[in-house]
Amino acid sequence: MMHAYDETYLDDAMNNLGDMFDYAVNDCGYDPEEFFRYFIVSGVAEAFGHGNPKYVTGLSGPELASEVISRTLKERPDTPPSEDIDKSSEYWAGWSLAYYQWYTARRFDHIRKAGLTMTRILALYATLHEADVSKFVSIANQIIEKHCADVGSNLQRIRKASGMTQKKLSEESGASLRMIQLYEQRRADINMAQAITIDRIARALGCEAGDLLEDK
């Protein structure tokens, strides 16, 4: 399985993202979900998710939080980080999220949009914080799969409205059945597909190529 970046960065990445959320929430007073959104819209999440050394190892957790706040709110916090020995639930949430993003190579914005919100992650703390992180991965996958099944992608919605099966769409468009399934489940990003692939799927469905793209 292809991961998001080299595993040698992983321990630092997990600790730093955990410290980032801990500092932002418990020292600076930000709402966990709100700060997760700031992390994404700031662009820091994109760089972090690609394993940019500046972000996964070069900045501490509080420094990451400061960068996020600076980019989104045009200010920097002056609150010093606390020196608590015990790890908070927010630390665990960020730590686990970093591992999940690395393991699946999904973008942070896709993870959140697919239902794995910070609220959902924090709700798992009581039962999973002492478990192996692989258990978190399993539960997180279930949450995302259920969310995607409930909501559906644009491709899935348009295909069903047309009355076409996945197999038929594969035959008509030339796209593999597996890729169509992955696009519908949002386990592959249709926005990143080759333009010719999207055009062929759109023609088979009788829609515009842009109708198949997902909002960010």
Q: Where in the sequence are the language-model features?
A:
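Conserved hydrophobic/aromatic packing and binding residues within compact polymer-binding modules
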Residues: 155, 169-170, 180-184, 212
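A short, Lys/Arg-rich alpha-helix, primarily the initiator
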Residues: 141-162
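DNA major-groove recognition helix of helix-turn-helix/homeodomain DNA-binding modules
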Residues: 65-73, 194-211
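The alpha-helix within a helix-turn-helix
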Residues: 25, 159, 170, 202
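Short coil turns linking two alpha-helices in DNA-binding domains
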Residues: 165, 176-179, 194, 208
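Recognition helix of helix-turn-helix/homeodomain-like DNA-binding domains
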Residues: 175-191
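N-terminal interaction modules that seed assembly of large macromolecular complexes
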Residues: 10-67
